Amino acid sequence: MKELSEVLQDWEAVIGLEIHTELTALDTKMFCNCKLSHDDEPNANVCPVCLGLPGALPVPNKRAIESIVKAGLATNCEIQRHSMFYRKHYFYPDMAKNFQTTQGPVAFAMYGHLDLDVTGRGAAERPDCAFGEAEAQSLESASANAEGLSTSMTSTMREGNQRAGHLASYDASNLQMPERRKDGSYTVPIRILRIHMEEDAAKMVHVGGAEGRITAAAESLVDYNRCGTPLIELVTEPDLRTPEEARLFMEKLRRIFVTLGISDCSMEKGSMRCDGNVSLRRRGETKLGTKTELKNLNSFKSLHDGLAYEICRQAEVLEEGGIIYQETRHWEPSRKRTVVMRVKETADDYRLFPDPD
């Protein structure tokens, strides 16, 4: 398998992140009054609401909604005046209700951006050929472009909301590449599609088998104390181009959330987790390739190394004439590889519809 630097000379990686953050500053769960603590005895902090028993009605946590508004303002998002909760159906043991309460097309915060400064070895990871003269622009123009998109798309979204009852996507084809400075550093605006509220799933412990991995465990135990924990999920547009950019974005977002006081953002404890979506395309092409989603990126190093491996793996498959399938893969840091977890679900598989409760 080729090295990452060699692969990125011929292939362009297209990366988007889904970052889940537990609102650890709160005392109770998202839709009930159960204590928010993962250190108690397993299944000690549960009730009919978080277990989805018949007749139990959820009540939104006001402080959780205030926290997501703070996060949206800090990331230059447009705060929506009207939003809805939806049911996202899937059948895994860590979700007792067989659906997750989340948000649909209209989230609490949408269409923001963060400017990402990339310097030193991180800047060197992105090849010079990614910055053609025809694409280059000044740092000030790049930032203004992102801000202009944020303003123009807000107007478009409002019009779409009146016409179709939901927010449509926006065209960002005019978002250009950044210009590399003399020292090799550059700044790139990373667009944020949405920040929405959802409840966390239960914690699963995989026992036995080789190194206790999910793929070889003898049995799995479920602790529902974490079920119903308020989460915010931030979804970026696929604007990241290297594993180092993804790592730096995650670090910057963590600093923002810690400063806001909405979460401790401890990746060791799992209060901040990241899923990476990555695809490849030949340099100069505009059509996106087939993406894979990476799980178990539970540290900054795992985020970088997992994405780097997957980029090299996809390049090897494509260069040998193979096909990349849309699937969810699990990063195994001990073996430094990704393995298939499941074929990726589509939106139809989730049967998303407004939560009547």
Regions found by a protein language model. Name each.
Residues 1-133, 153, 163-357:
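Basic, nucleic-acid-interacting segments
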Residues 2, 145, 149, 158, ...:
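Surface-exposed charge patches in extracellular/virion surface proteins
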Residues 130, 134-136, 142, 146-148:
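Low-complexity, intrinsically disordered tandem-repeat tracts enriched in small residues
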Residues 142-147, 154-159, 173:
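Low-complexity, intrinsically disordered segments with a bias for serine/threonine
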